[in-house]
Amino acid sequence: MCIRDRYSGPTTATVNDEVCKWMLSQKWQPSIRIASPYFDTPEYINSISKSILNSFKKDGTPDLLLLSFHGAPKRYLIEGDPYHCQCAKTGRLIKEKLKIHDNKFMISFQSRFGSEPWLQPYTDETLEKLGNKNIKHLSVITPGFSADNIETLEEINMEGREEFLESGGKKFTYIPCLNDTKEGMDLLHKLALKELAGWI
């Protein structure tokens, strides 16, 4: 099971390729099952939504909730990679689950590099624009990451916070990844049991 909630060629497919390469080298090949992406499963949506609600109770309801996903070159979308569409569906399902109005919700894409166009809107530019608007309290979550890392802790919670506050925002709340919380571990347990249902 690849701990990636959505499919993308450079991530999930790369893992699958390595598994298949290993299988080619085996004289006796075991039965294998590759878990499906879980970006739209009730278990995942409920876990992320609960994390968001817990943050709202602790830090207050923001003027806007921003979901920042890892970016990818735009050409991947044009070539048929479903990643962008799966990010959009995750966002829609979370928005519906939390009953958030369109004007209080956005998705964006972070971590771009190189010169070619990537999926938009870009998170860094979005944070600056939101600070310049009448958005005083912004909450940001990175639902595409199962655990916090340099791209969430530094790029969003440090650099992103600074961009938003320096452009006029007053309060920036970073909502951590599920990490090893009870919700995070329960999610992985449920997903594993679902995949194993026909095997054990």
Task: Give each language-model segment a name.
Residues 4-200:
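Extended amphipathic ligand-handling, pore-lining, and cofactor/metal-binding catalytic surfaces
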